[in-house]
Amino acid sequence: MTEHQAEEQADTPPTKVKATPTPTPSGKFKDAKEDAFLSTSPDSANGDAQHKLPADQLAMSSSAHPQQAGQARPLILQAFHRCSSPEQCVTLHDILDSFKAPLSEDQAWALIHQFAGLYHQVAVQAHTCAADYEAALPTGFELHFHRDGSVHFSGPDQLTPKEQLQQEQIPLPPQHDVIVDQPDHSASSSGDSSVINRAFDNSNHHHHHQHHHPPLVVSHRKIISELAEIVYTALDYNLPEDEECQVSQELENLFNFMTADETDDDCIDEGIDEGDKRWDDESEEERNDTKELEHIIETCRNHIKTTLPENHYRAVCRALVTETIELRVFLQQVLNNEAGAEKLIKASESSATTQQELAKLGFNDWARFWVQVIDELRRGVRLKKSNHERTPIEYELTPYEILMGDIRAKKYQLRKVMVNGDIPPRVKKDAHAMILEFIRSRPPLKKASDRQLGPPRMCEPSPREQLMESIRKGKELKQITPPEAPTLRERVLPSANSTLSRSRQRLIKVDFSKFQDDDLFYDENSISSSHSTAATHQHHPHFAEMHRCSQPKMPPYPFGGYMVPSQARQDCRETASLMRPRRTMEPAKQVPPPEEPSFTKDEYHKFYDTALESYDLATQCESRRASLRRHTIVGCQSNLDETHSMPPTRPESRQSDDVSKETPKRSPAEQTHPSDEGSSTSSLGPWNKSFMDKQTWMERGDDRLSVTLAEIVHIRSVMTKAELEGLPMDVRVKEDVEKRRVCFLCLRTRFSFFGPWGIQCKLCQRTVCAKCYTKMRIPSEHFRNVPLVLISPSLLSSPASSSTPSPSHHAQQAHSSSTGNIMDDQFPKSLIERLLRSESDRKTRSTVGSAPSSPKHQRSNMSTPGISVGPGASSSSAAATGQAVEALHDQATMSSSYSAAMRPSGVHQQQKQHYNNAMSRSMEGPRSLPVHSPAYRPLSNNSTLERKSRFSRGFNLFSSGSHLAQTQEQKENLRGEQVTVCNDCQGLVNEITSSVKQKRSSARNRTIQNLTLDLTPVWK
């Protein structure tokens, strides 16, 4: 506002407005019109939808119908019209008088934008009625706000009766004068009302100047100037006379532009781009008429950085109206309605605050508290960080000097002063609580129990939700009966179809009267296999031994051999005489299963006689035996034929005349059972019997590696890390094992600082306890021809020397149970420990249960030169010279032990002795031959024994005398240094060493066998 305008306003007498305050004695609202206005609430009849024809819609609808010249009055009434919904309309004076506080700067920007935009819609059509447009403008107007955010002007002039008849289509309700009651002591604002009256005064002070612009521009400038004065007065409302409102520089520049003098051309064109493309199609006159309004609107839009400034300013106006109406409703409940006031006071007051203290608050106090609460809700309350650092105490200056220094440095904080100075903080706090309680109750909410939610929308679940739902439901498993325990025949000689599940097979009894029993039956596979192979035995005799190649799938075991449960020994003795050997193999092509046949006694004996003849013919000469080895289980592995230099055991019934004389009427089953047992045990070594799976040998049997000790250490460390990933996570076992707190193998011994301490394995880097480790010698740094299955993590199993299983043992046990391994829970622990004893224990004891030692093993020890059994022979030299011999006969030892476990006592003891004698003669030749003949070779031949005897004698001579200490040192170097290894690594090294020794000795025996005359076929 310029000084010239201030002087003109001082000279011009103020005009009164319709909204005049009238004081009331008790601070209550007595006027009926005011009560009607105060009873309006935000949720009454949905006020947002009740207003009719907002100002902007009226302007847009009327713009489609251009007005004729001389009809300026209806055009101006589009903006300066009387509101048709007074209950939803609030004037600017009502807003200021309700809050008793000035507007904020954001609200001032919203007022300027909304009213400038409304007047711009009328100004763009003012050139059609330029003759009487200025005369139709009202001499004073007031700003009105609707609850939806729209605005309009209100002029004090009345229409003539003739004009009212012309505007019948436009509803014009009677003028509604809002009279605001003032409280007795705090609602006086006479000085502020005079300022508003001066703003509403239209003294036409612009007419005494010279008009350099068109009449429309002057009219627009008059409206813009009055709008700026009204907004500035609202910003300066209820402030002291000596205090000026603080506005930003941008808003101050806008006020200067809106109130600029008519002769100031620079201010008119300020910020206007002459080359703007918006006015390229308009005339120069229309462009100059509204450029001030467009500049004002553009400035307001640039002030807000949002994409839609119109929505923002509309929301500000809507919030201003809503807060005013809510405050009036709240004051009406507190000051007029005792029931509502008591309810709010009881909901918010504390024990120290009374109803009388809250009732003492005046209108201005409640309005100020309302503004504070709304400001906190909009801006939020942030807690300041408390500074706990205490400043050092000042002793050099006196308190007076410290105070004066703070005043000079302006180190002080201004305290907030109460309005009346007597409102305690607790009352202020309770007043805020009352206001918040009122805000929460608007609109009233229903109880959660009374609410009824509609049906949920049926939406199609996403693929992820479907997957999670299927995981939650789980898969229903079918009810299956537990599998029956397999018989001994199924364990030792399973069906030909090894890939299918093990099926129950019928045992053919010699008692032919019970041959067709209902409880015994054949399955289709066994019947078809018997028929298909019976016809091929005469033409293909090598098929007789091929059946032994098909064994049940089982993981390889380091020490090999099928185990027999102790509780099944009685069943073995009962069914041994009832079982016939199945020497046939499943043909290459399956035939459809025929009907179940019925055998006669002649057909029964003829069938097995043919099988025995084929077996005898196939084992009479060396070429036949080589052909047999290629088609049996030995042929499934390329290196397995090198481990057996002796011919397989012949049928017992064809080799023992004494036994056949004693039992001339033995049944075919009893005659062939020992040969079947011998061929299934003695022909397979302890390591080979653990690889009975044909597919395993086809895939991994030929794989051998040449690795060093460092590579084995690396492989074992990788396998250790893999086993760590398989440990359970929920019981902290994995964490303890990783941090080396618990033994890796037994998972029972816990290490501590005071003991026991863990020992780290040199190969796999595991930390084990004293029970799970041992010290052994590793004689070589490089191992050749190491089978791949020994270092494979899926095939390697932990040794049984440890009484407690390792983590890998649990995984292998689960694997064996799923693949049908015979090592199930039926085997007693004592039998497993005896069968899985370490190599040194098996060599010293070489027995299982009560069975005697193998005659083959005893004979080899007695007949081998260089082995001393007397007291003068040293144990170390005997062990050194007999190590190779015992390694060669390890297979025969396990075979005899296995047969002894099946028939430990009774009549079977004599049969076992006869079986061992027959096996020895079949491998050594007839008894009539001399001991040193080529046919009689317990190991390989004469030359081998002679070389070993010479080496043993030379070694004994060299060991005597002064060279004994040096010899012992050399022996220690050859045997290797003792290292600490766990039980798993010990079994691995033992198996690698024995496999390498077996490979070396079998290759040597095969070479000697080719150069030696074999007289076994000519012996009869």
UniProtKB/Swiss-Prot annotation:
Domain named WH2: residues: 399-417, 463-480
Matches recorded under Pfam families: KIND
Phenotype on disruption: Flies display premature microtubule-dependent cytoplasmic streaming; failure in the orientation of microtubule plus ends towards the posterior pole.
Principal location class: cytoplasm
Gene Ontology CC terms: cell cortex; cytoplasm; cytoplasmic vesicle membrane; cytoskeleton; mitochondrial outer membrane; perinuclear region of cytoplasm; plasma membrane
Effect on the protein upon substituting residue 734 to R: In RNA edited version
Biased composition regions of type Basic and acidic residues, renumbered to the chain: 651-676
Biased composition annotated in UniProt, kind: Polar residues: 846-866
Disulfide bonds: none
Reported modifications of this chain: Phosphorylated by Jnk kinase (bsk).
Segments of this protein annotated with the region Spir-box: 705-725
Listed GO MF terms: actin binding; microtubule binding
Biased composition (Basic residues): 205-215
Membrane keyword on record: yes
Keywords associated with the record: Actin-binding, Cell membrane, Cytoplasm, Cytoplasmic vesicle, Cytoskeleton, Developmental protein, Membrane, Phosphoprotein, Protein transport, Repeat, Transport
Residue ranges, compositional bias (Low complexity): 12-21, 799-818
Domain remark from Swiss-Prot or TrEMBL: Binds to actin monomers via the WH2 domain. The Spir-box targets binding to intracellular membrane structures.
Function according to Swiss-Prot or TrEMBL: Acts as an actin nucleation factor, remains associated with the slow-growing pointed end of the new filament. Promotes dissociation of capu from the barbed end of actin filaments. Involved in intracellular vesicle transport along actin fibers, providing a novel link between actin cytoskeleton dynamics and intracellular transport. Required for localization of determinants within the developing oocyte to the posterior pole and to the dorsal anterior corner. Links Rho family signaling and Jnk function to the actin cytoskeleton.
Subunit record text: Interacts with bsk, Rho1, Rac1, Cdc42 and wash. Interacts with capu.
Name of protein: Protein spire
Phylogenetic lineage: Eukaryota, Metazoa, Ecdysozoa, Arthropoda, Hexapoda
